[in-house]
Amino acid sequence: MKNEIHTILETSRTIAIVGASKNENKDSYKVMKYLQHKGYKIFPINHNFSDRKILGETVYDKIEDIQNDIDIVNVFRPSDEVIAIAKQAIEKKVKTLWLQLDIISPESKLIVESEGINFIENKCTKIEHEKFLR
């Protein structure tokens, strides 16, 4: 039986990585590389590297700068930055706001779910994806 996370990962194709890093030792880089290898179209977001490339993908300054539709916004930023990211996700009309391990934002959960956006927190997309490959 599929759960919500499995369904989200199975039906999504585009993922914006907020807090993307070009440092191969950072979790955001490792997760981004894994997801890209699994066939997802990745959109790295990091205002320090905008207009450069990470893993061959153009880096964007903000979610709104991406011209494509985004299925998942995957957040690698501190919890206190999530509300602003959630508001960008709502404006972009994304399907899911996903907060990585140790990132929690009850306020963001309330505002995105009130807009019909899926909300996942304190879970790693790579770890969750690997669970469904068994």
Across the structure, where does each feature detected by a protein language model lie?
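Mobile, glycine- and charge-enriched loop segments
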Residues: 31, 55, 60-78, 115, ...
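NAD(P)-binding Rossmann-fold cofactor-contacting core
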Residues: 23-26, 32-53
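Rossmann-fold NAD(P)-binding glycine/threonine-rich loop
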Residues: 101-129, 133
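Mid-chain, well-packed structural core segment of small domains
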Residues: 63-103
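Short N-terminal or domain-adjacent regulatory/targeting segments
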Residues: 1-11
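A short helix->loop->beta-strand "cap" motif at the edges of active sites that frequently abuts
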Residues: 38-40, 92-97, 115-117
